[in-house]
Amino acid sequence: MKRFISACILTIPLLLSACTPPIPPDVLASYAEKEVLCANGDVIVKASENTQNVIQSGIDLYVTSCPDAKVSIDNEAKDPNIVVTDYSAAEPEMCNAAIITTSLMNQFSTLVYYGEGLDGIFLSPEAVRGLLTGEITNWNDQKIAVTNPDFELPNIPVTFVEVENLHASDKAFIEWIKTITGKDIEIKPSKVVPDFQTLLQDFGTLNGVFSLLPSNIIYDNALTYANLKINDQDFLFESTAFAAASSQVSIFAETNKVTGALNSEVQPATDIGTSSTTNSWHGISYYDYGLCKDDADNSARTFMRFLSRLDAQGQFETYGYFALTEPLRVKVAGKIGEKLPTPSFNPEDLAQN
């Protein structure tokens, strides 16, 4: 028996699988963070005008480690290798027979506005509902005043401008407000425009305008956004609230799929370095990406694996998107990496995990 163990230890670097049980994908994924896999086949990513910048940032980071990689974005591609979507009408349709589908990143929505004397206001769910349904027609309405006692609210008419196709995070925000108020919400914009570029023309020029927008548009254009006051508690539209919401996740793992969804029954994770939790922002959606086709070298899968790395996820916030919570991210990386080369590591490290 001792000889067997001794021999096993001596041959671990070469025959680890013969002496240990199969290593779970989650464990392999955590070790894979230390390495960057590269593949040089052509990879076409179908994204959208909204996600193009954040995906391009991932490509640029990938190419710094893999200079021979050939990854490009084609938002009109008929036969892409990868599709990125939130499943709303504003984003591409997922490929019909995806080889694997996993979550990629989070997005959040809130109301944004432009109006003299309105900076820094808090809105109650009742006020948000009134603005979205058209019941509130002036910014000095009592439903807005009640959560802003130190403001002398201006007498400005409300103008609600919205794009034709809402994002999934916009719809999640509406559902959140609907749940809190216990009332249906049928949004009634004063003006509907085809795209964000047209919508943004009114911000900075039309006094009293507001819209419901996703975080990437808010961040890209430095728009003034609304925080919420719910049951006398402040809910802030900021990264700690986003992290709290992303930690409230149900993970759905199937044969070819690992995705996340908000579960408000899950206790939010505590803030880093503290024992407290931030109030979660439940206007959250998940962007998924699907592997539609690949080459013999797994070039598309390799790029997807790179986007699930912590360093790649960490730069999403610059573009108004946010990293997956760690348990989901590691499971995603493990699922994507199932057909990729096993990462090298010191076998002694395995005993410590």
Regions picked out by a protein language model, each given a short descriptive name:
Residues 62-66, 87, 113-115, 132-140, ...:
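Sec/Tat-exported extracytoplasmic proteins
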Residues 49-57, 164-182:
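Bilobed "Venus flytrap"/periplasmic-binding protein-like clamshell domains
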Residues 2-10:
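Sec-dependent signal peptide recognition
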Residues 82, 87-89, 188-313, 317-353:
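Flexible, solvent-exposed loop/hinge segments that line or gate ligand/substrate-binding clefts
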Residues 20-148, 152-154, 186-221, 231, ...:
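N-terminal segment of the mature folded domain
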Residues 13-18:
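C-terminal motif of bacterial Sec signal peptides marking the signal peptidase cleavage site
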Residues 141, 149-176:
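Non-catalytic, conformational "gating/processing" segments within enzyme and secreted inhibitor domains
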Residues 106-108, 155-157, 284-288:
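Extracellular structured ligand-interaction cores
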